[in-house]
């Protein structure tokens, strides 16, 4: 009779059963690995960007860009980062900061600029992909969801301008937005397992996402036979 209350009390105190504690530790370990993976994928994206190539777009598929909507915001962030780097260096020199400190701060700021460039490159080189096998929905290096053709019942146009967050799960709906917008919806026949950016798993039956040219994306879905489509708005 006391086992259940004791277990609840243990959870409140940060404990729990040994199995639960091991599971929690494993989840904590997933986050650093995924963060390192994001950085590695971003650096690969920089290399692809320089070579004007894209990641994961076979000849039989159609790339569906989404970088256009967020390009100005990301470039502005990059410019601010560069200005901050220069301003901090000038300030540290003016107050006579020792060279090792200046070099350390400069290195950290330069790495921040590199990461900002990597995110921009990942957004450009990792578009959504629509092909005969299905639909691949991505958000830079942070999310990569493959939707098999057999699960897709409908792709339709929508106009949502008030989405919250770039990547979010609301019930059984996955939302992948750009500057708070989505304009395409994919409906599924059954729940699809989705791994969120920091490793948490969700099961979704609807996906809302953004494309720079949603009409072209819908046409690609129709011509590739990737889905049963409808152009109705939602």
Region spans (language model):
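Conserved beta-hairpin
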Residues: 111-159
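Cytosol-/stroma-facing membrane-proximal "stalk/adaptor" domains immediately downstream
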Residues: 200-234
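Hydrophobic alpha-helical transmembrane segments
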Residues: 95-110
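N-terminal membrane-targeting/pre-transmembrane regions
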Residues: 2-97, 202-206, 219
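Non-transmembrane, membrane-adjacent beta-strand/coil modules in membrane-associated proteins
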Residues: 139-208
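Hydrophobic alpha-helical transmembrane segments of multipass integral membrane proteins
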Residues: 78-88, 106-117
